[in-house]
Amino acid sequence: MTTVNDRNWKVLIRPNRPVVQAGYDAKRKAKLVVEPLERGYGTTLGNALRRVLLSSLQGAAIIGVQIDGVVHEFSAIPGVREDVTTIVLNLKQVAIFMESDTPKRMVLRAKGPGEVKAGQIETPGDVKILNPDLVICTLDGGSEVRMEFTVATGKGYVAAEAHRPEDAPIGYIPIDAIYSPVRRVGYQVEDTREGTVLDYDKLTLDIETDGSLSPEDSVAYAARILQDQLQLFINFEEPTLETGGAADETDLGFNPVLLKKVDELELSVRSANCLKNDNIVYIGDLIQKSEAEMLRTPNFGRKSLNEIKEVLAGMGLHLGMEVPDWPPEDIEGLAKKYDDHI
């Protein structure tokens, strides 16, 4: 039986898994739709995830450049149409994937005439340029340029001066970096219906990344960061739910209590009728339903949902569980065979 304190979180509706709506470039753009959420939770979760997505995910960026013949960033390079300041701005847009946490060196050598693109940069084996068509500069005929870059990993925004080594050679130009692989995040909260109740939120996250991380993975990592930070505030131990129970004494592979019929749960008439009308016969059928699926059952409301969740919790079970190979063959025969276990 759940306690009053347990009901603080157990009676809240749990949303379905996010639905991913891929953009024209699935590796970079997508919308994630989450519903149903308790009223107000769309804004709460959307704002928290957006802030973490933009500020806290690890990524790679160019943090410094040294150009042959250039002493400082306000110089002009003979035969190069762009000045150094413009080149530095272009370098900030180079999208990079790098697994190592050790800074790496990259080199660019080019001869004119023509555009010099990011794809011409010579990279170590564990570094990849994700937007090779990005134009870095344009060379006139007969001109050439050589640049050496430092690339590193980090999070958030770091100012250029923080990237200047103490032993930096003359001509080394530090670059401020936006490490985050997430380029843009927006969210929208709308009303949504579950069953007959129009009192829930639908959260839509609109995410664009640089391609080093997919939108859905970026949300997963952001959620993991929030989980890790919030865990520190939980000052009590939660009881472990025994989902196996008597299964250890049988060869079923699951708890034989799942073979018990739902009409034996002593539910209210309304809840029992809703389960019957939805062809939910056994507890094993019931626990595999999500809360959202249950609320879509005709005449099934929040009161019935809370009643069922409380009864299942008293048995060490909950909605949304997975039971491999369910339903088993000859389920009625198995129910009689293991009647003493249930």
Curated annotation (Swiss-Prot):
Entry's Gene Ontology BP terms: DNA-templated transcription
Gene3D superfamilies hit by this protein: 5' to 3' exonuclease, C-terminal subdomain (1.10.150.20), DNA-directed RNA polymerase, insert domain (2.170.120.12), RNA polymerase, RBP11-like subunit (3.30.1360.10)
Keywords in alphabetical order: DNA-directed RNA polymerase, Nucleotidyltransferase, Transcription, Transferase
Region feature Alpha N-terminal domain (alpha-NTD), mapped onto this chain: 1-237
InterPro entries per the UniProt record, alphabetical: DNA-dir_RNA_pol_insert, DNA-dir_RNA_pol_RpoA/D/Rpb3, DNA-dir_RpoA, RBP11-like, RNAP_asu_C, RNApol_insert_sf
Pfam families: RNA_pol_A_bac, RNA_pol_A_CTD, RNA_pol_L
Top EC class for this record: transferase
Gene Ontology terms: cellular component: cytoplasm; DNA-directed RNA polymerase complex
Region named Alpha C-terminal domain (alpha-CTD): 254-342
Domain of life: Bacteria
Gene Ontology molecular function terms on file: DNA binding; DNA-directed RNA polymerase activity; protein dimerization activity
Reactions catalysed: RNA(n) + a ribonucleoside 5'-triphosphate = RNA(n+1) + diphosphate
EC number: 2.7.7.6
Job description of the protein: DNA-dependent RNA polymerase catalyzes the transcription of DNA into RNA using the four ribonucleoside triphosphates as substrates.
Family: Belongs to the RNA polymerase alpha chain family.
NCBIfam families, alphabetized: PRK05182.1-2, PRK05182.2-5, rpoA
Domain notes from UniProt: The N-terminal domain is essential for RNAP assembly and basal transcription, whereas the C-terminal domain is involved in interaction with transcriptional regulators and with upstream promoter elements.
Oligomeric form and interacting partners: Homodimer. The RNAP catalytic core consists of 2 alpha, 1 beta, 1 beta' and 1 omega subunit. When a sigma factor is associated with the core the holoenzyme is formed, which can initiate transcription.
Name of the protein in its database record: DNA-directed RNA polymerase subunit alpha
GN (gene name): rpoA
